[in-house]
From Swiss-Prot:
It comes from Euglena gracilis. Homodimer. Residues 1-37 form a transit peptide. This is Pyruvate dehydrogenase [NADP(+)], mitochondrial. Its main location: mitochondrion.
Length: 1803
């Protein structure tokens, strides 16, 4: 080394140097025998100075022949060197640099040793900042350390970069240069990141190609050791990092030779070590800081010479000689460009072309950017240069110019002879914008022009500021002669990219050809567009731009030919291969005319293959990659066919061997079939194609953004968009993915209406919101396409029609919905044939108004009727993340703000131009923003604080406006209501529009109103959500998240836990479970999963929940609770990911989620601080026990299986430890559940376990009510779902009460199925002899399988020897008080049998507060379910006036939608005179206006007059239940009355007497005058008026706009002789024409079949109504010319003369041939009573024909008493007419029930 490179060390320090040398192992006083190198400063007593270390000479003879060819990408080329010359690496994933760290981790896991014979220690950190800190620490300890990063990751390293450079520590950071997030995030290439660290003191060395990535990495590692200056080695992200090229690489032995002797030892000697201690990183004051800073100058002064010297030293080893500045071009060039990175090779090609054309041009290609050597730069410039264009791949908005431009300009100013050279700057290639030779030619044209554009841009059209230079796309060919080019268009996850990577390596590693491959992707995570650009040739290929003149193009997805101009890039006579199902005739219709013209005019050889069909036959499904690859090798001739076939088969073993022999065999079979057969088949191109005329064009949407920006983006034409169409700042409209219509699914779900139970599970789990429930009116159904089949809607949508509809062109075909459906109501069908039909259906469905407001949006089922405001995202098929966020938008979307961390959710949720977040019909929807990866919690926190502050301001203004009454009375009332609800859920949404409308009209009245109107967007209670993945929450963003959760701020955090960094390719995070194999943990993760939720719970004031798709109801509940909590909340959702490698595929995502819960792998729990304030345990464990096999669960995921293949013993050990950890964690949660608030054992010593099986929550609610009753009777109680117990524990439970519902056709609820399965297994006789039990079933007695599950459990427990305490009880949904009626009749027997003492009652705490507010304005109140209906006729009696029974018909005018068979619910009002009489007796003034503050869920008016409240709302004339009497006894002052009330409450004889006398609430208050609850309690104790339901006798098709009722005005005489009439009957009996009442539609079991099927109808009395409706409907259809099936009606009533209802109409149907009628009038002949069931027996042949042979349907409507006899009669008919046995006849009846052909409506 030249002496000038380092100053000579002063003699004063020589002794210290010698002394220091002995410390590192040299012999003191011995003369050096080898070359002397300078490295690093030596510690002295007060200051570090440089010194020399002498080491023995070693064999460093270059051997360039040791190099080997290998086809690698830039990342692998770099990692090869970095791994060899490092001993530690600290890594963190960030695209596009992650691959470098992944490879280092792979090699470490494989035990590969570096050049020094040691396995590199590769450690993943929590962030790039952590990686830099660890790097600094390792260097301080003397390690040879490195890291890999990009973009924001590099910026996070800046503080430590200053430290490392300041302390003169040798190191290399390898950077895949990438853009920084500014107006938008871009993962693509640019120099913004590296330019942001140019001031840190690190040397910066740039690679331009894949080969240089290897070489410059080597030069960096050598030069840093020689100079003690750390290096940033960078190359262009993606374009170089991910380009595959065949390059020469040095083996480790050769790399080791290049390590300067003694430099590593010198570095070690400077380490922090107690054997030679120093102090580093001190605090310096003003007296010495400046000087110490300047003391390092000597290390930088000649650093450029050190680098050049290193390049010279490396050259003999690699055969490639580099310069820090390389000049190419004419020696007398006048125009020169200066640039670095991958664009350099493109400019080089352009220079060669221009020089051949006689142009005097050249280029300076920069390698060493920092330190910038002015001398070296000036030296390479030709003396003839007149103009220079400095090209930067970054933009610095506020600077005079970009960095390279400034450096060039400053350099030339230092040389007088160069000061006349004109320098301009330009930008190119930002965000990996393809930089092609034509762009380079345009730059030279601009440079040579008279007035060149300064600070120009190239590759874009800047029509705003005019910076862009024009270029002509002349398709110049600058490639080496003999280069062949290919493009493969694929669909994400079809294997195309992987196959092409394999193909390049096959060709590169098995031939003399050089190879290059580059891969392009769109924004979709999976199922997106991929294009693979491959080149092959005899000479090295450095063209770093996309293929534009291809010899071979393959399109692996047929729809692409309609979207992409892919043949624009094919040369004349090239080969085109299409995977399609089309015949030549189909192609005429399907392939656009311009595409066909290209085929013909360019004389393209066109081949077609139906790859999917062929691969299906081999069992490969959509994985068509190997078939298409075989076609390529067969047609391209790149390799000899036999060799290509052999190599392909070998590559299959390598690629798929780990997936099993079967997969290998299938892929090899399909490859061999291609080589052996006539695949693909050449298409004989019709001559007419050359002149094909466009017959159709894409229909514009009329939305400018979609037509002008989004569609070009999707069609890969974004490069053509000008600057003027962009919005400065990077904002984009929402709801654009609905226009994408990618149509990527080969199969889509088809709805099977007959099987559907309308649970909406399919909609919940759909990752892309492509399958949804729709509710329609009859009128809407009539307008629907013929294929738009519906069925009768249930629940809140009574009277309407239900359909599950898929969006066929948005569906990804993931099959999650099909696999999740519990009723087999979905099946996958061929998309090719189904899409045309379903497209029409979808287009119709989405135009139907959303009716989500008609149901409870905060329930599982109800949430799915809400419009998803996240739809058609770019997430992978089967994604486990999107359903959570979709649910969030359905629950709170129209008032939600989302701060989204960078990661998967920001890519599928925030890709420019393709926004899946959308709006409702009002234009409201989630506002979404992304800051960075590391700061998302703080970003969201800032939004929350700002919105809270703004809302507080608007609240202050509204408070003043209300106090000052500046608005009219109506608006003031609304604003006052807003003040009450302003921070409570979505209550304000109900009247928000009214407020805004009122403000718009009145804002000119007062400045306060003007201010409020100006802040109207703050009126909603904004729901703030912070969303991100587990890597963000547990690692890089944990510090911020922890602070935000600790802040107490009201906001919500949702962590989408895939247990790895999914977005960057599946690297381990701290959320990754032990034993899992992930990138950066290929040897299996050896530490426990971080428990983020427990950390959050430790604060005590954070709502915390874990959720999973395996328990959808719990998930919905947790979301609702979290959002309602006034404070920070944290929800962590288990999100299955494609990176998990589910053996059954992502279609089974929900089942695997269920298994995760069952095995304890993912426990479900909620921590609600509000419960602690109530004295309850805030911790709620929702998965009560471990009940699955953990090992089986793990064995279904490749991430756990792969470790066992590589390290069986290690895998078993880690999995065993994980199982122990999971068990220990679960036991800890059990202890938390039993925590300090758990009651001690009951004093009585009695204990009961209450178990429930619940689907909708009824059984669970009843179980918890029962638990309270047992606790009051001094029992200790445990309440659990049946599936949460271990069945083996039953024998030790002592006493068990089971409450269980029946679902569907006799099915167990989901949370009891495992219990029943286990209980059915073989057990020892008398196994449960020590168990006492009782069972209560919930069901609907009109169903054949009424309480079937309860009966099964009861019988099974008895068979196992358990002792039945009391007989099974039944709760009938059809009873007036639903299941409570049966429960209240059953439970006393339990208390009696147990001999429990009657507990002391405690008065409940009311959920309402009541105030007298005389100045308030009363509100008009209607129940949510009600709609005004107008009586057209009043009540028209149809039985004689003197007859005792009064049947009436009523015609109603209404817009309510209903179906034949539905009932009309009528909301009665109490008689005003009776109410006023009661109020006067009670001492209440009916005119008083009261305000009710309602904290519960009950529907009550906010402000109302007392008289109206008791008339319209409270059921004061209803029948009290036994609990009412208990409560009333608290208020009884008179002792005798109190005792009597308590006696009645025990449900003894007096209670029965009261029931028989039909006493109502008003009666009871008269009977007990000393019991006077306050108005507050009175309202609590008296329930709301319920609608009474009456069968509808009309059909919408017959009398549209009308509903007809057939009603029996029911009156009766009580035992005491009192005359009673029902409340509603009283109102209807006196109904007048034109009178309006509140009504609603209620669905019944009467769901009628296809009109061509026969039906049998049995009616008693007014039960005739639905059958009249059915007859009217079929009669109308027949008149329309439609075919209808046979109809038989069996009608029963008392007397023919007076009660033959609708006689004339029924006779008319008989005469029309529509109806067979049989009537049974039971009291006409007292001696011989005839009933309906008797008449059925007489028609045995007709019954057998209609119901068994023709599979018709049976309907019964009327009294419950005739239901069973009719069934028996049917069985009789089947046996007699069909010759069936009794068992066979029974099975036929059962089949009718289970297939929905037997319907009952009984009372």
């Amino acid at each position: 080394m030249k002496q000038s490179v380092r100053p000579i060390i002063s003699n004063v320090l020589r002794k210290e140097v010698a002394l220091y040398s002995t410390i590192i192992g040299q012999d003191k006083g011995k003369e050096p025998t080898g070359r002397t190198y300078t490295s690093g400063p030596k510690p002295a007593s007060h200051i570090e100075v440089p010194h020399h270390v002498t080491v023995p000479a070693t064999d460093r003879t270059p051997n360039p022949d040791a190099q080997f060819f290998q086809s690698v990408d830039g990342s692998q080329a770099t990692s090869h060197v970095a791994y060899a010359l490092s001993d530690t690496a600290f890594i963190y994933p960030i695209t596009p640099s992650s691959v470098m760290g992944e490879l280092a981790d792979v090699w470490m896991a494989q035990g590969r040793k570096n050049a020094f014979g040691q396995v590199v220690d590769v450690r993943e950190m929590q962030s790039e900042a952590g990686a830099a800190g660890a790097l600094h620490g390792a260097l301080a300890a003397g390690a040879i350390a490195t890291t890999f990063t990009a973009s924001q990751g590099l910026l996070l390293m800046i503080p430590n970069m200053y430290k490392i450079a300041g302390e003169l520590m040798p190191s290399v950071i390898h950077v895949a240069a990438r853009e920084l997030a500014g107006h938008a995030l871009s993962i693509f290439g640019g120099h913004a990141d590296v330019m942001a660290v140019r001031q840190t003191g690190w040397a910066m060395l740039c690679s331009h190609t894949v080969q240089q990535s290897h070489d410059m990495a080597l030069i960096s590692h050598v030069a840093t050791l020689k100079s003690s200056i750390p290096f940033v080695h960078f190359f262009d992200g993606f374009r170089t990092s991910h380009e595959v090229n065949k390059i020469k690489m040095l083996p480790y032995a050769e790399l080791k030779k290049l390590v300067p002797p003694g430099t590593m030892e010198q570095h070690w000697a400077r380490s922090l070590n107690p054997m030679h201690p120093t102090i580093r990183g001190t605090n310096q004051s003003a007296d010495i800081y400046f000087q110490n800073m300047e003391s390092a100058n000597q290390y930088y002064t000649d650093l450029a010479e050190v680098v050049q010297e290193t390049m010279d030293e490396v050259a003999p080893y690699i055969g490639r000689h580099y310069k820090i500045f390389e000049y190419v071009g004419a020696p007398d060039a006048e125009e020169v460009t200066v640039l670095m990175g991958s664009g350099a090779t493109t400019v080089n090609e352009a220079v060669d072309l221009l020089v051949k054309r006689g142009k005097k041009v050249g280029a300076v290609l920069v390698h060493l950017y920092r330190p910038w050597s002015t001398k070296a730069f000036e030296k390479v410039l030709p003396k003839t240069v007149k103009r220079i264009a400095a090209l930067d791949r970054c933009k610095e908005v506020t600077a005079l110019g970009e960095p390279l431009y400034l450096d060039v300009s400053a350099t030339l100013n230092l040389f007088p002879e160069r000061q006349n050279v004109k320098v301009i700057g330009g930008r190119y290639g930002l965000g990996s914008k393809d930089f092609i030779p034509e762009h380079a030619l345009a730059i030279y044209a601009n440079l040579a022009s008279e007035n060149p554009i300064q600070r120009f841009t190239v590759g874009i059209t800047d029509d705003v500021t005019g910076t862009s230079v024009p270029f002509v796309n002349e398709r110049v060919d600058t490639l080496p002669e003999g280069t062949r080019q290919c493009v493969f268009w694929g669909i994400g996850s079809d294997g195309t990219v992987g196959a092409n990577r394999s193909a390049v390596r096959i060709i590169g590693d098995n031939s003399d050809l050089m190879v290059q491959a580059y891969f392009q992707f769109d924004a979709f995570k999976s199922g997106g567009v991929t294009s693979s650009h491959l080149r092959f040739g005899p000479k090295p290929i450095t063209a770093q731009y996309l293929v534009t003149n291809a010899d071979y193009i393959a399109c692996h997805f047929q729809e692409y030919v309609k979207r992409f101009d892919m043949l624009d890039a094919i040369r004349e006579g090239g080969t085109f291969v299409l995977n399609s199902r089309w015949t030549t005739e189909d192609m005429e219709k399907e392939i656009p005319a311009d595409f066909r013209r290209n085929v013909a005019q360019k004389k393209v050889r066109f081949y077609n293959v139906d790859a999917r069909k062929i691969c299906d036959s081999f069992g490969l499904g959509k994985r068509i990659n190997m078939l298409m690859q075989a076609c390529f090798f067969k047609l391209s001739g790149v390799l000899p066919l036999a060799e290509a076939q052999r190599l392909l088969n070998e590559s299959i073993v390598h690629e798929y061997g780990k997936k099993g022999g079967k997969v290998v065999e299938m892929n090899q079979a399909v490859v061999n079939a291609v080589f052996a057969g006539d695949l693909p088949q050449e298409v004989q191109v019709p001559a007419a194609w050359a002149n094909a005329v466009d017959t159709s064009t894409r229909t514009p949407t009329g939305i400018e953004f979609v037509d002008k920006i989004m569609r070009p983006l999707m069609d890969f034409k974004g490069d053509q968009l000008p600057v003027s169409v962009m919005t400065p700042g990077g904002t984009f409209p929402v709801g654009t993915t609905q226009y994408a219509k990618r149509a990527i699914a080969a199969f889509i779900p088809q709805w099977i209406p007959a099987n559907c139970t309308q649970c909406n599970y399919c909609s919940y789990v759909c990752p892309h919101a492509t399958i949804r429930p729709f509710v329609l009116t009859d009128q809407e159904v009539q307008l629907a396409p013929e294929s738009f089949v519906t069925r009768k809607a249930k629940g809140d949508y009574q009277g309407m029609n239900f359909r599950i509809q898929v969006a066929p062109e948005d569906c990804t075909g993931c099959q999650v919905c099909v696999e999740t459906c519990p009723d087999d109501a979905l099946e996958m069908t061929d998309a090719f044939t189904a899409t045309p039909v379903q497209r029409t259906n979808w287009e119709f469905a989405i135009k139907v108004p959303n009716r989500g407001t008609m149901t409870d949006r905060y329930s599982l089922k109800g949430s799915q009727f809400q419009q998803p405001l996240l739809e058609f995202s770019g997430a992978c098929e089967g994604c486990g993340e999107t359903p959570y966020v979709k649910l969030l938008t359905q629950l709170f979307g129209e008032r939600t703000v989302i701060a989204n961390a960078t990661g998967c959710s920001s890519i599928w949720g925030g890709t420019a131009g393709l926004a899946p977040y959308t709006t409702n019909a009002k234009g409201q929807g989630p506002a979404w923003g992304n800051s960075l990866f590391e700061d998302n919690a703080e970003f969201g926190f800032g939004i929350a604080v700002a919105n809270a502050q703004k809302r507080s301001r608007v609240r202050d203004c509204i408070l003043q406006a209300v106090e000052k009454k500046v608005a009219d009375e109506g608006l003031t009332t609304l604003l006052a209501q807003w003040l009450q609800d302003w921070n409570t859920g979505d209550k304000t949404l109900k009247y928000q529009d009214q407020i805004i409308a009122g403000l718009a009209q009145q804002r000119s009245k007062d400045p306060l109103l003007e201010q409020i109107y100006g802040m109207k967007d703050m009126l909603p209670n904004i729901s703030q959500w912070i969303i991100g993945g587990d890597g963000w929450a547990n690692d890089i963003g944990f510090g911020g998240l922890d602070h935000v959760l600790a802040s107490g701020q009201n906001l919500n955090v949702l962590v989408l836990d895939t247990e790895m960094y999914s977005n960057t390719g599946g690297q381990a995070s701290k959320s990754t479970h032990m034993a899992s194999v992930a990138k950066f943990a290929l040897g299996g993760k050896r530490t426990n999963k971080k428990n983020l939720t427990e950390m959050a719970m430790s604060y005590g004031n954070v709502y915390v929940a874990t959720v999973s798709h395996g328990n959808m109801a719990q998930c919905v509940k947790a979301f609702v609770e979290a959002e309602s909590y006034d404070g920070p909340s944290l929800i962590v959702g288990y999100a299955p990911c494609i990176e998990h490698g589910l053996r059954a595929g992502m279609a089974r995502m929900v089942q695997e989620s269920e298994a995760a819960i069952a095995t304890g792998y993912w426990p479900l729990y909620r921590f609600d601080p509000r419960l602690a304030t109530e004295g309850k345990n805030p911790f709620q464990l929702d998965s009560k026990r471990i009940k699955g096999n953990l090992q089986e669960y793990l064995d279904r995921q490749n991430r756990y299986v792969n470790l066992k293949k590589n390290n069986p013993k290690g895998a078993d050990l880690l999995k065993s430890q994980m199982a122990d950890n999971i068990t220990a964690r679960f036991n800890r949660y059990r202890r938390m559940l039993e925590g300090p608030n758990t009651k001690a054992a009951a004093p009585s010593g009695n204990h009961v376990t209450i178990l429930y099986g619940s689907e909708t929550g009824n059984s669970e609610g009843l179980a918890k009510e029962l638990a309270t009753d047992f606790e009051r009777r001094e029992y200790s109680v445990a309440v659990q779902a049946l599936d949460d117990i271990d069945v083996a524990d039953l024998e030790n439970m002592g006493f068990v009460v089971i409450a269980v519902s029946t679902c569907g056709q006799g099915q167990f609820p989901r949370n009891s199925q495992l219990f029943w399965r286990e209980l059915q297994r073989d057990k020892p006789e008398g196994w449960l002899k020590n168990l006492k039990y009782t069972v209560f079933g919930l069901g609907d007695s009109t169903y054949y399988f009424y309480c079937h599950t309860a009966k099964q459990i009861d019988a099974r427990l008895a068979a196992l020897g358990a002792q039945r305490v009391v007989p099974i009880g039944f709760g009938d949904d059809g009873d007036e008080d639903m299941f409570h009626t049966g429960f209240n009749n059953w439970i006393p027997s339990v208390w009696n049998e147990l001999k429990t003492k009657t507990p002391e009652e405690a008065l409940f705490t009311p959920s309402i507060a009541v105030q007298l507010t005389p100045n308030a304005t009363p509100q008009d109140f209607h129940f949510a379910k009600s709609t005004p209906v107008l009586s057209i006729t009043g009540a028209e009696r149809i039985t004689p006036a003197d007859h005792t029974r009064n049947f009436v018909t009523i015609r109603w005018k209404t817009d309510l939608s209903y179906q034949v068979g539905d009932s009309l619910g009528v909301f009665p009002e109490n008689t005003r005179s009776v109410v006023e009489e009661f109020l006067q007796y009670y001492g209440l003034n009916p005119k008083d206006v009261i305000t009710i503050e309602n904290k519960g869920s009950r529907e009550l008016p906010h402000c109302m007059a007392v008289g109206d409240l008791f008339t319209k709302v409270l059921d004061i004339l209803g029948k009290p239940n036994n609990r009412f009497y208990k409560t009333l006894s608290y208020f009884a002052v008179d002792k005798a009355e109190k005792e009597r009330l308590l006696k009645i409450a025990e449900m003894g004889p007096e209670y029965s007497n009261i029931l028989s006398e039909m006493y109502h609430y008003a009666d009871i208050f008269h009977m007990f005058p000393s019991a006077r609850p306050t108005l507050q309690y009175l309202i609590e104790m008296i329930p709301n008026i319920k609608p009474r339901y009456y069968s509808i006798s009309s059909a919408p098709i017959h009398t549209p706009g009308e509903v007809h009722s057939l009603v029996l005005i029911d009156t009766w005489i009580t035992l005491s002789g009192k005359h009673r009439t029902g409340l509603t009957c009283t109102m209807l009996e006196h109904l007048q024409a034109g009178q309006v009442v509140d009504g609603c539609i209620h669905p019944t079991a009467m769901e009628f079949p296809d009109h061509e099927k026969p039906v049998v109808m049995c009616a008693m009395g007014s039960g005739l109504a639905p059958f009249v409706a059915f007859l009217r409907e079929r009669s109308t259809l027949r008149k329309q010319g439609k075919k209808t099936g046979n109809m038989a009606l069996y009608f029963g009533n008392r007397y023919e003369k007076t009660e033959f209802l609708m006689k004339e109409e029924l006779k008319g149907h008989i005469n029309d041939g529509l109806l067979t009628l049989r009537c049974a009038f039971s009291r006409d002949d007292p001696k011989k009573k005839v009933y309906v069931q008797d008449l059925i027996k007489m028609d045995e042949k007709m019954m057998y024909d209609y119901l068994v042979v023709q599979k018709g349907s049976m309907y019964c409507c009327g009294s419950r008493s005739f239901i069973k006899p009719v069934q028996e009669s049917l069985k009789h008919c089947f046996m007699k007419a069909g010759g069936l046995t009794a068992e066979q006849a029974e099975n036929e009846v059962i089949d009718m029930f289970t297939t929905g052909r037997y319907n009952i409506e009984a009372w």
